[in-house]
Amino acid sequence: MNPTTSGSAVSTLEEKNLGRIAQIIGPVLDVVFPLGKMPNIYNALVVKGRDTVGQQINVTCEVQQLLGNNRVRAVAMSATDGLTRGMEVIDTGAALSVPVGGATLGRIFNVLGEPVDNLGPVDTRTTSPIHRSAPAFIQLDTKLSIFETGIKVVDLLAPYRRGGKIGLFGGAGVGKTVLIMELINNIAKAHGGVSVFGGVGERTREGNDLYMEMKESGVINEKNIAESKVALVYGQMNEPPGARMRVGLTALTMAEYFRDVNEQDVLLFIDNIFRFVQAGSEVSALLGRMPSAVGYQPTLSTEMGSLQERITSTKEGSITSIQAVYVPADDLTDPAPATTFAHLDATTVLSRGLAAKGIYPAVDPLDSTSTMLQPRIVGEEHYETAQRVKQTLQRYKELQDIIAILGLDELSEEDRLTVARARKIERFLSQPFFVAEVFTGSPGKYVGLTETIRGFQLILSGELDGLPEQAFYLVGNIDEATAKAMNLEGEKK
């Protein structure tokens, strides 16, 4: 990582390599430069001037193609309203650079690294270009290790890999945001790490809601902004495709600085990775490339790879990425989600059925998967416990139809015991979150992996068969469940 320390991201404006706009097609500009002064691919170009009404214009573009005849084709990072042919264009001589480091925490940025939260300027002495190659093999940390989140259902059944990529699947209103905020909170407390949130092509309202909830839950500290645990980068639905295509790289660049220079563990959230592909598809068509399968860009897997390969563990620190995945028309074979799946180490699937039952986090224990759940990685004890939990829940799922029609009494003794334990497991998979304290009033719990395994082993062994199932609902470790059972017993008397 070689961040530059300069007063401005635009370093060579003094030399002023000037061109002029020759053609504008929506967010794509063709610019003519003097002979021998052609900018490089990915150079940032700046258009400054006034529109026909006299309003100041300041549009940054990125060079995508060199067309010949001293022409380049560039994609705008903001709206091209008011631009006219013949306007002056300045070649900055460098790629887009964004602020990095502690100054970014608690702040909201756009794709260019400009703050958009009305909290004043950001210290831009340390900036970093958004385009760079993935770390070399020799720098990578190849040791497979679990990233403990303190969330029981995740750590036991679909553990995250340190420096891995996790797909987050779930519809609206099943608790994606709260789960994301809890992960941000836990990485800061347990791992001394920070988080970067990249809002890629999603609703502006949701971005605003997330910001407000983060302030309310303390993830962003309003009184002392430097104490915040997260930096936010947004390029939402209303932005041109150039911004939506690059905002993921802006967020990743900020995360890389925390990993490589501060040597921290970083969580990078991308919401939504599908919109990154969608924006690339729009830009590809505007640049005149021949579309590939289902109308996507021919460079789909290259673009995805160049983003995903930068998300990894090095010997300095790690970037663990959690990516919300929108599946168009629920078609998992669509090229966009199919290309994403090739990069994922784990999937966390949120279930509306569990949310309706009031079991939070509403992570589906049977649908969520992880490549880390192997005995040689997590150990025999963890693996065996996870498999037995899944078998018990699977059997309960199979018996539900019989229970619905005939009732519990028609089941065999063994099946009744399985159902009772499965219901306890289901409730024990819920837990109170720190970030939800404000709403629920019950204090949050971080449960270590060994405690989680011990708790489920006790339920499976039958030692806790005598306890009522509500004792297992929204508690931390198993000792709290037994204490809650005693309280319930006392209340009955």
From Swiss-Prot:
It is a peripheral membrane protein. ATP binds at G170, G171, A172, G173, V174, G175, K176, T177. The keyword Plastid applies. Its EC number is 7.1.2.2. It catalyses: ATP + H2O + 4 H(+)(in) = ADP + phosphate + 5 H(+)(out). GO terms for biological process: proton motive force-driven mitochondrial ATP synthesis. GO terms for molecular function: ATP binding; ATP hydrolysis activity; proton-transporting ATP synthase activity, rotational mechanism. It is an enzyme of class 7 (translocase). Pfam families: ATP-synt_ab, ATP-synt_ab_N, ATP-synt_VA_C. Keywords: ATP synthesis, ATP-binding, CF(1), Chloroplast, Hydrogen ion transport, Ion transport, Membrane, Nucleotide-binding, Plastid, Thylakoid, Translocase, Transport. InterPro entries: AAA+_ATPase, ATP-synt_VA_C, ATP_synth_F1_bsu, ATPase_a/bsu_AS, ATPase_alpha/beta_chains, ATPase_F1/V1/A1_a/bsu_N, ATPase_F1/V1/A1_a/bsu_N_sf, ATPase_F1/V1/A1_a/bsu_nucl-bd. Signal peptide: none annotated. GO terms for cellular component: chloroplast thylakoid membrane; mitochondrion; proton-transporting ATP synthase complex. Its main location: plastid. Gene3D superfamilies: 2.40.10.170, Bovine Mitochondrial F1-atpase, Atp Synthase Beta Chain, Chain D, domain 3 (1.10.1140.10), P-loop containing nucleotide triphosphate hydrolases (3.40.50.300). Produces ATP from ADP in the presence of a proton gradient across the membrane. The catalytic sites are hosted primarily by the beta subunits. HAMAP family: ATP_synth_beta_bact. F-type ATPases have 2 components, CF(1) - the catalytic core - and CF(0) - the membrane proton channel. CF(1) has five subunits: alpha(3), beta(3), gamma(1), delta(1), epsilon(1). CF(0) has four main subunits: a(1), b(1), b'(1) and c(9-12). Belongs to the ATPase alpha/beta chains family. This is ATP synthase subunit beta, chloroplastic. It comes from Lachenalia pusilla (Cape cowslips). The lineage of its organism: Eukaryota, Viridiplantae, Streptophyta, Embryophyta, Tracheophyta. The gene is atpB.
